[in-house]
Curated annotation (Swiss-Prot):
PROSITE patterns per UniProt: NIR_SIR
Cross-link 3'-(S-cysteinyl)-tyrosine (Tyr-Cys), sequence positions: 54-139
Cofactor: how bound: Binds 1 siroheme per subunit.
Catalysed reactions, semicolon-separated: hydrogen sulfide + 6 oxidized [2Fe-2S]-[ferredoxin] + 3 H2O = sulfite + 6 reduced [2Fe-2S]-[ferredoxin] + 7 H(+)
Known role: Catalyzes the reduction of sulfite to sulfide, a step in the biosynthesis of sulfur-containing amino acids and cofactors.
Entry's transmembrane regions: none
Assembly description: Monomer.
Protein name: Sulfite reductase [ferredoxin]
Amino acid sequence: MVTTPTAAPRKPSKVEGIKERSNYLREPLATELLNDANYFTDDAVQILKFHGSYQQDNRDNRVKGQEKDYQFMLRTRNPGGLIPAQLYTALDDLSKTHGNQTLRVTTRQGLQIHGIVKKDLKMAIATVVNNLGSTLGACGDINRNVMAPAAPFRDKPEYGYAWDYANKVADLLSPQSGAYYEIWLDGEKVISGEEAPEVKAARQKDLNGTNLNDPKEPIYGQQFMPRKFKISVTVPGDNSIDVYTHDISLVVITDRHGELRGFNVLAGGGLGRTHNKEETFARAADPIGYVSKDDVYDLVKAIVATQRDYGDRHNRRHARMKYLLADWGVEKFRKQVETYMGKPFQSFKPLPAWRYQDYLGWHEQGDGKLFFGLSVENGRIKDEGDFQLKTALRKVVDQFQLPLRLTANHNILLYDINAQDKAAIEQIFQQHGVVTDPEAIDTLVRYSMACPALPTCGLAVTESERIMPSVNARLRDLLNSLDLPNESIVTRMTGCPNGCARPYMAEIGFVGSAPNSYQVWLGGSPNQERLAAAYTEKMPLEQLESLFEPLFVYFKQSRKGKESFGDFCHRVGFTALREFSHGYTAPAKGGKNRKNQRRVSLSDEMYAQLKARSERDNCPMNQIVQQALTAYLGK
């Protein structure tokens, strides 16, 4: 009898075993914290992430033949970007005494300190916790920092609901075993605020398998999630948090009286990918349905349980929930979530168009007080020459005891400001070389983002934060030379394909692919409503102008009205972009044409007809002219 061999069972990834053996995120981290080594082993590093820290190697300081320059990055978990004045002061002090003298606002509304050494790590985390902060769950295979619009409007109740539920969802999905407090605070649990009773009840409520038979971690169990998990809560129309990029996005739905009714639900977003691995990809979230406010915790637990139980624990490159939706399809995913939830989704509610907002400058809160949005280029709070942002911000926080809200575009909002303090606050920033008028900031800089990358991020293959200012400056010079001086384009850059600065949603995305080389993505929208696509696989930085000059010229010639560059690229398509670029000859310096370039004048009427036909047929003007001349001369 011939039998068909059965496939060998798939082996869980190495990290799954590390989590399972960790005793709920304790070991080997707790033991290794006590030794004299200046680093943790690979197994301990995996557990350290759950506690909000990454082990890094400063490659600028690395000496050939010597051991790595080990140091640690610490990241806060603060839903909705809230940083009380007391916490900011403590973080600023830590960065001076035990860090690299800077702070970094993240693209998930947290703060990072870089440069902490291992022997100071316990003290640093304890300092954060004792000053109204936390790092628990800021990293690792767990629900990360829950995002919400940072704007502190007091007269728009939907914003209050977004903040409230960002906090409650974060509490619902916070680890429960107590390992964090045992390791970093010797077992003393410090609580900055009481957990809402409905959150406690929701955590213990077992629907249809949402909870595991595990009293220590009823939602996560001892292996937690297959990979990182990201959630946002926003309000209709406000896309300051990149709504399509999360595992779950909840959209607050209110009635005409401003009372909360429920939430629209999107799921399956995620941007991380790997170069040359086509099975990995960026994905925008899908609308799933609507739930009433009474069902929102059940909904969140049902989606988490679906990913927990069906997400890929064998291949970490395929472990994010976006791949589950891609493999299953939205309908199968929706039905599984409904099975856990015990009831069907209602229909997705109509929404207005999404709009990116950065809230820079001065705004009324709606309660008689003001808030002020401060641009932080690439999120780095630092002092450098005459630019003394770190000093100025500390003076303002100390003098006025203002809380901060960090934005998803790594900027800062100071709020609860008395109107009479506005002039004094502006003066402090201006005296320290900080621009306070958002209209004075180049829009390329204002709307750009970059990840930290080199020298500290272990995944970076090239520069990002340190090179982005010069890239934006070169793009601006090029636009100016082409008589496009006021053009606003969303640019984003990462030093690797993991997508921390969300380059795949930008109009122009630079994704590090090799030293000083970038994959270029085009076609995202100014309001981050769709994914861009890879236009070229590897652009050396020295070829920046030669790549973008023909694209900008084509854009100038063939755009429709005030069409954005990203919308233009999406409309005409990459074939047309490449054809135009291939046939483009740049004018010689000094305004003289190259020998092989000829000019033919057209009447205004003929040019208008040519442009109209180009827009109607979605065809470049030079291609229409070429075809017409070929036909005419061939007679």
